[in-house]
Amino acid sequence: MIKLGAKELRTIKPQKGELKKIKKHPIYIILDNVLDTYNVGAIFRLGDAVAAEKVILCGQTETPPHTRIKKASINTTEWVQWEYFADTKSAIDHLRLTIDHLQIIAIEQSSKAVPYDKADYSFPVALVVGHETDGVSKEVLKIADQIVEIPMWGVNKSLNVMVSLGIVLFEVMKAARFK
């Protein structure tokens, strides 16, 4: 395994030919009013890690270029495709019009949620994560095809938005690989 130091991580700059060789997965990561810029940057890193098609920033979510997003993303904002929409419902409506058979999955604690490891995942998929305090908006939960949640056994009943997304993203990759 290769271990890179902080300086090396922050100075990685892939060549255009290198980027074209990467097979993108039909995964769209939607941020529904995620406020913490470090979460936004870390989500760009997750998008890069799974070769997601696009990160979609909505509402009050800050957009690149932003110093803290860039730092947390270790420059992945430079090559991970992203788009901004004023509201999340408009983003989802746009994606549904342009991508056939798109599955919208909200990651949220809800009485309608199924455990993330029991959900039915297929490509193309859009994963929606929400505001750090308020979660995914009710409007988005109503139009999601599925709501998934991560079981919690301790005293604390919530995880950081980026951590939750990472867990579900890798479950999506695992599940989709076998279809």
Language-model features: where?
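Post-transcriptional modification and biogenesis factors for structured RNAs
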Residues: 1-179
